[in-house]
Regions:
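Beta1/beta-strand and adjacent pyrophosphate-binding region of the FAD-binding site
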Residues: 1-12, 27
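Long, amphipathic coiled-coil "stalk"/hairpin helices in large membrane-associated assemblies
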Residues: 13-18, 31
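Gly/Ala-rich phosphate-binding loop of Rossmann-like dinucleotide-binding domains
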Residues: 17, 21, 145
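Short beta-to-alpha linker loops that shape the active-site pocket of alpha/beta-hydrolase fold enzymes
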Residues: 32-34, 109, 142
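Helical element adjacent to the flavin cofactor pocket in flavoenzyme catalytic cores
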Residues: 126-147
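Glycine-rich FAD pyrophosphate-binding loop
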Residues: 21-40
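Dinucleotide-binding Rossmann-like beta1-alpha1 core, especially the glycine-rich loop
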Residues: 44-115, 121-123
Length: 147
């Protein structure tokens, strides 16, 4: 008999179950044959601390140190670039402000990502503090913690 049942074996469910397992008996129910089968296993696995709604940004900031340091860290530097067409200027400006992105020239954007066609975008921005998350290792560590 479990004290708590967590439904879903993706990153959110496994994370919650791992934390709860420190104090309770926890069972994770997953419909698929493997954990992380859907979005958690197929995502771009990007950690950008300032991305999302205010509630998401708060969670990102609260978890940043854990992702950097726990079990040797789960983050690898990648950087984040955004590009936008002229008609998306307002949304681009909002992202620059809320995410702390530095505006860069189209030439610099193409230098960083040579496949970009400068005729297809008007604005570009770059932020070094974007990271890849090793989601597989993170989920496996959560599973070990749950057991």
């Amino acid at each position: 008999m479990s004290d708590i049942v967590v439904i879903g074996g993706g990153i959110a469910g496994l994370s919650a179950a791992a934390r709860l397992s420190e104090h309770f008996s926890v069972t994770v129910l997953e419909r698929e044959q493997a954990t992380g089968y859907h979005a958690s296993g197929r995502s771009a696995a990007m950690f950008e601390q300032n991305y999302g709604l205010p509630s998401t940004v708060a969670l990102n900031k609260a978890s940043a140190q854990y992702h950097r340091e726990a079990n040797g860290g789960y983050l690898s530097p990648r950087g984040l670039m955004i590009i936008a067409a002229r008609e998306d200027a307002e949304a681009f400006d909002d992202d620059v402000v809320t995410m702390g992105i530095e505006r860069i020239s189209k030439d610099r954007a193409v230098e960083l990502v040579p496949i970009l066609d400068p005729a297809k975008f008007t604005f570009a921005g770059y932020h070094e503090a974007g990271y890849d998350i090793d989601t597989d290792r993170l989920m496996q560590d959560f599973i070990r913690q749950i057991r």
